[in-house]
Structure formats: structure tokens, C-alpha cells
């Protein structure tokens, strides 16, 4: 039996810049080596917080719906949008609740704190252990390749356009070296007052 989190393939990467943060994913949905769709986005947003989820596609969809419900409930109770740091704790506790029958996912959180304006990124394992970073977080079937590309290309305090170029090159080159991811990509550049979404074309083989 293969690892359930690699059956459908897919990758997510997040990077911090100067007063900005970027998160990107590929668009492939597969069933091992069989391609199913090239329009499967793995990044979701709840207010100004972004969540990328790799892993088993059914769990990705389930978690998106669950976090949509929980963040809407939070907004009703607290009368404010959830901050990235708070959302990270919510993701962690939600995954840990299911530790004996876990969701087979690798979530990545990215966002800008609305008060301090500081960029924030964090990753998790499938039972909710938090991995905060100041530079980049990777997840998915090409995570080894992404680590190599990010360590080669990343520089601290990049401007938004330079950050877009860096995260795009890292994702495109990593996906080219992994049979289970690719088929296009989507990149979000998040600043305090705006979000830019761009699609990248990739090889379709």
C-alpha cells in the first residue's frame, strides 16, 4: 500500500519577503500516475489568511470546508477576522483532534498580521505539529526538490515582484522533477493592503 498522502500528488510552497508573503501550488490532481485534472487548486483563503493543503484530495476538500466553517464561527463570535498566528493554532488543534485517524495532509499557512504588518508562514505534519519559519515552508510530493530550489534561490527581504519570480522558479523547477505534481501553477502575492493572484503555464506531460 502506497502512502495515502502521495496518491493524488501536489505541492505547496510559501515564502516571506519584505512586508509581503507568497504562497503557491501546482494544479495537478492525479491518481498515482493517472492524470485526472489540471484545475485542482490547493490554496484557500479565509479573510486575509491563506491555507495551502497537499495530500489526499478528499481530505483537502474536507479540511477546506471545516476551516471555512470554523473561521466563519470565529468571526461571528469575536467580531473580527482571524489572524494568521491564531489560525495556525486552530489548524494544529483540529489536526491533533484526529491524531488516531488522521487526515493525510500537509497544510501550509501564510498571511500578514493586520496589526503589525509582519509576514507569517507555518507548516504542519499530519497530526498538527507546527513548523514556523522565517524564510520558506514546503509541502507535498516534490518537497525534497522544493527544499533544494528554495535554499538555492531564496534571499531575505525580497520585494513583491522579486518574491514572485523566486517562488515561481522554485515551484516550476521542482515540479519538473516530480511525476506526481505540475500541470500548471497558481501564485498568490500577499501584501497588507492587496493580494495578487497569478497563474503559471507549465508543461502538460
UniProtKB/Swiss-Prot annotation:
GO-annotated cellular components: cytosol; nucleus; proteasome complex; proteasome core complex, beta-subunit complex
Keywords: Cytoplasm, Isopeptide bond, Nucleus, Phosphoprotein, Proteasome, Ubl conjugation
UniProt cross-references to SUPFAM superfamilies, sorted A to Z: N-terminal nucleophile aminohydrolases (Ntn hydrolases) (SSF56235)
InterPro entries: Ntn_hydrolases_N, Proteasome_beta_3, Proteasome_bsu_CS, Proteasome_sua/b, Proteasome_suB-type
Transmembrane region(s): none
One term of GO molecular function: endopeptidase activator activity
Major localisation: cytoplasm
Claim: Cytoplasm is one of the keywords in the record: yes
Residue positions, PTM Phosphoserine: 31
Cross-link (Glycyl lysine isopeptide (Lys-Gly) (interchain with G-Cter in ubiquitin)): 70
Listed CDD domains: proteasome_beta_type_3 (cd03759)
Family, similarity comment: Belongs to the peptidase T1B family.
Assembly mode: The 26S proteasome consists of a 20S proteasome core and two 19S regulatory subunits. The 20S proteasome core is composed of 28 subunits that are arranged in four stacked rings, resulting in a barrel-shaped structure. The two end rings are each formed by seven alpha subunits, and the two central rings are each formed by seven beta subunits. The catalytic chamber with the active sites is on the inside of the barrel.
Protein name per Swiss-Prot or TrEMBL: Proteasome subunit beta type-3
Organism: Saccharomyces cerevisiae (strain ATCC 204508 / S288c)
Amino acid at each position: 500500500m502506497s502512502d495515502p498522502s502521495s496518491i493524488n500528488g501536489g505541492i505547496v510552497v510559501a515564502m516571506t519577503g519584505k512586508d509581503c508573503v507568497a504562497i503557491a501550488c501546482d494544479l495537478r490532481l492525479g491518481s498515482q500516475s493517472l492524470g485526472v485534472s489540471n484545475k485542482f487548486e490547493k490554496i484557500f483563503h479565509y479573510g486575509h489568511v491563506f491555507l495551502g493543503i497537499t495530500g489526499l484530495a478528499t481530505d483537502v476538500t474536507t479540511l477546506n470546508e471545516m476551516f471555512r466553517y470554523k473561521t466563519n464561527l470565529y468571526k461571528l463570535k469575536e467580531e473580527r477576522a482571524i489572524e494568521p498566528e491564531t489560525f495556525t493554532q486552530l489548524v494544529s488543534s483540529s489536526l491533533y483532534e484526529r491524531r488516531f485517524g488522521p487526515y493525510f495532509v500537509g497544510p501550509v499557512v501564510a498571511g500578514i498580521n493586520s496589526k503589525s504588518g509582519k509576514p507569517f508562514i507555518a507548516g504542519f505534519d499530519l497530526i498538527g505539529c507546527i513548523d514556523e519559519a522565517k524564510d520558506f515552508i514546503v509541502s507535498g510530493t516534490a518537497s525534497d526538490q522544493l527544499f533544494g530550489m528554495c535554499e538555492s534561490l531564496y534571499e531575505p527581504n525580497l520585494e513583491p515582484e522579486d518574491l514572485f519570480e523566486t517562488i515561481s522558479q522554485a515551484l516550476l523547477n521542482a515540479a519538473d522533477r516530480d511525476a506526481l505534481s505540475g500541470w500548471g501553477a497558481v501564485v498568490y502575492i500577499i501584501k497588507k493592503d492587496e493580494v495578487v493572484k497569478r497563474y503559471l503555464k507549465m508543461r502538460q506531460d
